[in-house]
């Protein structure tokens, strides 16, 4: 299973036979129209994840705590990888973390890859209570999480202690 980073940077012969999510086409077109034209000539399998596999990916993202920082394209890629038990090629640390926590084999491209698997939680800035990430958490690259159910203060994503 190839992440968009592999599509952008790997030689075409290394991409042959790789599995990709249909949603990656739009991402690739936005990032590099010229590369997208080259990719069209590569022997890739383009698939759309099922709702059931997307639900599995969301639950895996919630279990690791990474869900709010995963994009819809990230979730599509994870869903296809989880659905088929495919190895995942990505430099995205959040995707690596979620995939490893879900039991998938992950390969980094240009980085050394994540050395540890972490769990993330929403921690209240007021009372410091930790809240698990819900499987229906909205995706946002930055910003606070839901308000604390104890004191009403905003929460921030933090690595789970202990």
Model-derived segments and their meaning:
Residues 1-84, 94-162:
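Feature 3881 marks metal-assisted phosphotransfer/nuclease machinery
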Residues 88-89:
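Conserved SAM-binding loop
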């Amino acid at each position: 299973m190839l992440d968009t980073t592999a599509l952008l940077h790997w030689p075409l012969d290394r991409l042959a036979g790789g599995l990709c999510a249909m949603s990656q086409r739009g991402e690739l077109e936005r990032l590099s129209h010229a590369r997208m034209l080259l990719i069209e000539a590569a022997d890739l399998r383009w698939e759309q994840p099922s709702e059931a596999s997307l639900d599995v990916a969301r639950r895996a993202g919630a279990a690791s705590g990474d869900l709010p920082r995963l994009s819809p394209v990230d979730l599509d890629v994870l869903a296809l990888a989880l659905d088929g038990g495919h190895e995942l090629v990505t430099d995205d640390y959040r995707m690596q973390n979620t995939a490893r926590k879900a039991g998938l084999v992950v390969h980094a491209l240009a980085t050394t890859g994540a050395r540890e698997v972490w769990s993330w939680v929403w921690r209240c800035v007021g009372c410091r209570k930790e809240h698990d990430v819900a499987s229906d958490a909205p995706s946002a690259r930055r910003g606070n999480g839901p308000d604390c159910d104890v004191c009403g203060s905003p929460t921030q994503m933090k690595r789970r202690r202990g």
